[in-house]
Structure formats: structure tokens, C-alpha cells
Design a protein with these regions (language model features):
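Bacterial N-terminal signal peptides
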Residues: 10-21
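Beta-strand-centric surfaces of beta-sandwich/beta-rich domains
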Residues: 28-378
Length: 378
């Protein structure tokens, strides 16, 4: 009897585990092309690189090297100062599934902030994505430290990956501009599908970059400046350069949506709490949250709202406070909390339908690269 009960329990456990795996995989697999075994999606796979800049069938690897035609003839290209390279120009319906890049980033401090990614969906004149390459690829402060999350993976030698689906119905164009003063070698590959059957209410990926150096005392930093219309907040890559000692991260994230005025619908409890760590900032990169860099007063952290979606129907604005903690303030104010100023940046990701409003004004090169790797004053 005991053996039968144990066998039943083991069988039930296996079935539960199996069903749990199927259930947990389904939502994300639906976004990335359906179940792994579904061969009836009607989609076709394509890839764009310098070896096949159009992604057309049978057109890859035609360039010639010293080894002959088709033998690694055009894997990379140097991007001159001021030059803009078209990464892809795709007609028809499809979804960009993955982008990989590497090149002359690792030993050039400013390169990941001086190079700018822009994306245009459905021939809209203004970009829906406008962001420094490093922040778009998951790392603040132009520091490509090795880590992995649900959205990004970064290798030790600045191999950069992003895995967010970027759907389009009629047209997709992405560019990369070198605003710096040095020639930068670029290797890249964009993997995408065509023939996708998108939902009627299709959100397109939007990404904006904001930096305040320094922030304004008692004026909360905007992670997502106000957007009108419906959308879904995906997450953000946040950079902090502390401008003084003491603990900097008591500020709360506030998500104002759908008519909120003075007080938000969603309110966090602290800066490190928002990225799901606690009692200070530890360099701990996890799947949906964490910190990929924490050294000498420079912090790069992230939060992805994939299993815990944040939707809005009419409008949304997201902020984070700049509040510190130090015992030296207790005698003066009765509390260890105090307002402070630091250097904050954000690369924020969300989906919204088209046509969409212009993104906030993009910071110029000087503003983007200022104070990289300056140690904070004690």
C-alpha cells in the first residue's frame, strides 16, 4: 500500500511538473513564434548582416576574401565619425527576434554612448527607438560588463545581444550612427521572421534614453516621460553615478497611469527594491531584475516586467525619487532620509501602437558621454 501511494505521488509530481513547464513556456513562446514544435505558423526565417544586407534567400556570403568568394569576405565594416549605417530595411510583415553586435567597443570608453541606435516602424518619419547602443543593449555608463537577463546577454569582450520581439506590419528600418570622433569596427546580425500573423492591436517597440546630470533636488527623475494612448511598459536599464557618499537608493518608483494626478497607482518602496534586491545594491544579475555593474559609485541595474506586465489604457508616466539615507541627518531632522542629487540615466522599453508621438528630445553627444568613469567625491 505504501509503495502504491509513493508511486501515485511520484506520477502526480511528474505530471504536475510537465504541465507546469508547458504553462510557463506558453506565453513567451507565443511571442517568439509559437510552440517549439509548431511547424504551421506560416513564418519564414531570415537574417541580415554585412554578408547579406537585404536578408534575401540565397544572397548571403557572396563577398570575396583572400581565400576566395564566399570565404568570410565581408563580416565587418568600419563606421567613420558622423556616418550612419542602415542595419536593416525590411518590407512586409515580420518580427525582429534577436540582434547581436560586437566590434571596437570594449577598449573605447565612450563608444557605447556615442553610437546611437534608431528604429522606424511602418515608415513613420520619426524614430520609435532612439538610444545609445550600450544602453539599448543592456548596459549603462558605456560599460559592457558580462551578464545575462531575460532581455539581454553581454559577453566578456563586449558581445551584445537583445532578444525582445520587435514586430511590424509593413516596414522596419534600423540605423546605427557614430557620433564619436573615432572609426568603430562593427560586426552584427539581425535575426527575424517574415509572414508573421500579428494581432489586430499591435504594439511596436519604443525605446527612449534620458539622462539628468545632475538631477534636480526634490524633482523626481523621469524613467518614462508621459505617453498618451495605450501601451505596455516592458522595463528599463537604469544608470546611477553617485555624486556624494552615503546610501543613495531610498527613492521610490512611481507609475502614474490613466488619470493619476498627485499620487500614482503603482508605488514602490525603494530604488534597490524596484530591481528586486534589498538592503543596499549588490552586483547580482538575475533573469528579470538585478544589477550588472556596481563599482566606484557607478551602478547599472535593470527591471523587466515580463511575467508581471504593466499595461495602461490612456496615459502613463514613470518616475523615481532621489532620496538618500544617513544617520548624520537624524539629529537635525529626526530621520535618516534626505533629498539628494545624483547623475541618473535610463533606457526605457515599452510597446505602443502607431502612429505614436515623438520621443523626448535626445541628449547631444557631450551630455551623453560627460563624466564617464569619474569617481564620486567623498
Amino acid at each position: 500500500m505504501k509503495t502504491k501511494n509513493l508511486l501515485k505521488l511520484a506520477t502526480l509530481s511528474v505530471i504536475t511538473l510537465f504541465l507546469g513547464v508547458i504553462q510557463s513556456c506558453s506565453p513567451e513562446q507565443a511571442e517568439s513564434g509559437g510552440q517549439l514544435y509548431d511547424l504551421g505558423t506560416g513564418m519564414e526565417s531570415r537574417s541580415i548582416s554585412f554578408e547579406n544586407p537585404t536578408g534575401e534567400p540565397g544572397q548571403g556570403g557572396q563577398a570575396e576574401s583572400n581565400l576566395g568568394v564566399g570565404r568570410k569576405g565581408f563580416p565587418a565594416k568600419g563606421i567613420a565619425p558622423g556616418e550612419t549605417v542602415v542595419l536593416c530595411d525590411i518590407a512586409g510583415a515580420g518580427t525582429i527576434r534577436h540582434i547581436w553586435m560586437t566590434g571596437g567597443f570594449k577598449d573605447r570608453t565612450e563608444a557605447l554612448r556615442s553610437m546611437v541606435v534608431r528604429a522606424y516602424w511602418e515608415n513613420q518619419e520619426h524614430p520609435s527607438v532612439e538610444c545609445p547602443l550600450g544602453d539599448f543593449m543592456g548596459s549603462a555608463h558605456a560599460k559592457a560588463n558580462s551578464y545575462q537577463s531575460a532581455v539581454h546577454s553581454v559577453g566578456e569582450r563586449a558581445s551584445l545581444n537583445i532578444w525582445l520581439p520587435m514586430p511590424f506590419n509593413e516596414h522596419a528600418k534600423m540605423t546605427l550612427t557614430n557620433d564619436g570622433d573615432e572609426n568603430i569596427t562593427l560586426f552584427y546580425q539581425i535575426d527575424y521572421t517574415i509572414g508573421d500573423r500579428h494581432p489586430e492591436k499591435l504594439g511596436r517597440l519604443h525605446v527612449c534614453f534620458v539622462r539628468e546630470n545632475p538631477t534636480t533636488l526634490t524633482t523626481d527623475f523621469e524613467i518614462l516621460p508621459k505617453r498618451i494612448g495605450e501601451g505596455r511598459f516592458i522595463g528599463t536599464v537604469l544608470g546611477v553615478r553617485t555624486l556624494e557618499g552615503n546610501w543613495w537608493g531610498e527613492g521610490e518608483v512611481k507609475i502614474f497611469m490613466d488619470g493619476d494626478t498627485e499620487f500614482p497607482t503603482i508605488c514602490g518602496t525603494g530604488s534597490e527594491d524596484y530591481v528586486c534586491v534589498s538592503y543596499g545594491m549588490q552586483q547580482t544579475p538575475f533573469f528579470y531584475h538585478g544589477c550588472s555593474w556596481n563599482k566606484d559609485g557607478f551602478i547599472s541595474m535593470y527591471r523587466w516586467h515580463l511575467p508581471d506586465p504593466i499595461y495602461w489604457k490612456k496615459e502613463c508616466r514613470i518616475t523615481i525619487q532621489q532620496i538618500g539615507w544617513s544617520r548624520e541627518y537624524v539629529e537635525e531632522t529626526g530621520s535618516a532620509l534626505y533629498e539628494r542629487k545624483d547623475d541618473w540615466s535610463s533606457a526605457t522599453f515599452w510597446y505602443e501602437p502607431l502612429p505614436s508621438a515623438k520621443l523626448p528630445e535626445f541628449p547631444d553627444l557631450e551630455s551623453r558621454v560627460a563624466n564617464l568613469w569619474e569617481e564620486p567625491e567623498e
